[in-house]
Amino acid sequence: MVLKFSLHSLHGGVKNLDEIHKRAKRAEELGYDGIFLGESHLSSIDSFQTLASCAMITQRVLLGIAVTNMVFRHPTVLAGAAASLNEISKGRAILGLGTGDGPVYGQGLKATPLKEFEEGVKLIRHLVQGNPATFPSGNVGIGFTISKPAAIYVSAEGPKGLQLAGRSADGVILGTGFDLRVYEWARHKIRAGAGEAGRKESDIAVIAAGMLCVRGDGNEARRIVRNRIANRAHHNFRFTYETVPPEELEGVKKFMAGFDAMKPMEDRVDPDLVNDYLVHRFSIAGTPEECIERIAELRAAGVDHLMLTAARKVYHESVEAFATKVMPHFQK
């Protein structure tokens, strides 16, 4: 099985479009399969417009939003934007959706309730497939050419979100990390949701997501990602502790109690509370050889697409080393 490798958050910490374009072009040159941008509308350049511009300078890579929400953008606006990006990129767009995270809470707003969120996912998917939807004013659909439907993914970590994705989405961006036991648990929830909607598990693509750091010294790599995974881990455990082994539960609860979402990213938690379990679960960090061993285990478990967020501190070094020393082992 040939694995797909995508990069996430190319625009993290980047203040100008030229640098993002350089990163996008280099990702394609190195053989990555996709580039994904998160959306934080005041702290980062607009993701939809940025990806549309990246479509003009790339030929092959998937262009994904991972993720946006329905708090700031109405589902019909998202449908139109996704369909537009897919036309501009000639079928390479993926729209990743979540209920709302940092940018939403930071403005004192609330995440979209799951029932409303699922209705929105279904509406967006319905519209990008070229179908009209019924509104008080009558039937309304996308009025421009849709050569191919954009893929609609749901970012999910908790059991309800995973089942929702199985019922309603084309794919799942799996934020539960790279623990094989958790991966099997998540697939079970997705399978259950798919069954509720009369779908097959194979109908839903799964992208496993986490942090990346490749260094000559594996311990250094794990030190670098320790703070950066804190936000990811905190987001995950807000939904459930169900996936935490009993022997790790006390440490995870201490981490959650010590996390302050209102502080800057690097200062939200004492690094000593980000233990080895969290680093291992939410990152692929180490020497090239250690990364190869880890990914081989994931592939054997059925993982076929990884979305990796390179640590900002060593972004270029990690992206280059991973592409030249790790990826070739899985692209034969």
What spans do the regions from the language model cover?
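Short, acidic/polar
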Residues: 15-27, 78-81, 156-167, 225, ...
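Conserved, mostly hydrophobic/aromatic
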Residues: 31, 54, 85, 124, ...
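Active-site mouth loops of central-metabolism enzymes
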Residues: 4-18, 68-75, 146-157, 212-215, ...
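Alpha-helix-loop-beta-strand connector modules within alpha/beta enzyme cores
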Residues: 48-68, 72, 123, 127, ...
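N-terminal beta1-alpha1-beta2 module of alpha/beta enzyme domains
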Residues: 1-65
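Hydrophobic faces of well-ordered beta-strands that scaffold small-molecule active sites
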Residues: 3-9, 35-37, 63-66, 93-97, ...
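An alpha-helical appendage that flanks or caps ligand/catalytic pockets
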Residues: 110-142, 183-300, 331-332
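Glycine-rich, proline-tolerant flexible connector loops at the mouths of alpha/beta enzymes
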Residues: 34-57, 69, 101-104, 176-180, ...
